[in-house]
């Protein structure tokens, strides 16, 4: 476990390791959480004993994205810190040389959806939900999440999710390619995730990492270039004049 207790690993055998997101109660994203996640993924990616990673949450919500009550009060430094966390955290996952299976047992919303999009195989519970709500809370996309969304979602799905901010259920998510398999219950979710991880773990590891980089290398390079050009610290901050009111509307339920 990390010092903060946010990340916990469990050996599932045959080199497969479960990485549990444990920032209770809904895996709300913070700068520290995301940077610890990036460091842990980098560590696992370089560990020769790890053949595949299963990413999951012990909570009813997989990840709810930002804590809006907290985020609406962010000053410039805090805005830059969370942008850096989003960029670095999801870049680490997207570029991880090891196979990653996301076992999505609940809602994955806004920034929380990028744990799913940056994984290699995605299993969704029959009651899971998926959305990119940034437009509804008055925030655009940092360079890392933006490039991952553009690379993993077709243009029609980008329109459906990113321009409306509305969530979709598991069947629509499978139709749109966000998830590959739907599990009817939590037991099946674990069974399917482990099954898919075992399949991936049996592949030649160097070749898997090489092919993954062939597919994702250009996107990774664009994210790194964007970060180098100041993408972790946007001038004037991440938020705009509409953000606080939009977040307050969402918190009150008027943004539903």
Language model regions located:
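C-terminal long alpha-helix characteristic of the crotonase
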Residues: 123-128, 179-228, 253-256
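CoA-thioester-processing core
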Residues: 89, 109-162, 192, 196
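Glycine- (often His-adjacent) and acidic-residue-rich active-site loop
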Residues: 35-36, 49, 56-89, 136, ...
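Structural motif
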Residues: 56, 103-104
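Well-ordered beta-strand positions
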Residues: 121, 160, 164-166, 172, ...
């Amino acid at each position: 476990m990390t010092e903060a207790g946010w990340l916990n690993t469990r050996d599932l055998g045959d080199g497969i390791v479960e990485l549990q997101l444990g920032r209770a109660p809904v895996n709300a994203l913070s700068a520290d959480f995301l940077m610890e996640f990036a460091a842990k993924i980098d560590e696992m990616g370089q560990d020769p004993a790890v053949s595949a990673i299963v990413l999951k949450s012990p909570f009813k919500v997989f990840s709810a994205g930002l804590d809006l009550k907290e985020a609406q009060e962010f000053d410039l430094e805090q805005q830059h810190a969370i942008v850096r966390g989003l960029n670095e955290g999801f870049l680490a996952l997207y570029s991880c040389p090891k196979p990653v299976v996301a076992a999505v047992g609940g809602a994955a919303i806004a920034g929380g959806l990028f744990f799913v999009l940056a994984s290699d195989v995605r299993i969704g519970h029959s009651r899971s939900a998926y959305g990119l709500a940034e437009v509804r809370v008055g925030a655009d996309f940092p360079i890392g999440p933006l490039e991952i969304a553009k690379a993993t979602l077709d243009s029609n799905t980008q329109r459906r999710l990113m321009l409306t901010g509305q969530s979709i259920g598991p069947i629509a998510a499978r139709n749109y390619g966000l998830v590959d398999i739907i599990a009817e219950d939590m037991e099946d979710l674990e069974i399917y995730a482990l099954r898919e991880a075992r399949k991936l773990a049996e592949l030649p590891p160097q070749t898997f990492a090489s092919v993954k980089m062939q597919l994702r290398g250009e996107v990774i390079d664009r994210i790194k270039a964007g970060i180098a050009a100041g993408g972790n610290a946007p001038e004037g901050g991440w938020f705009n004049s509409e953000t606080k009111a939009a977040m307050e509307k969402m918190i009150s339920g008027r943004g539903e």
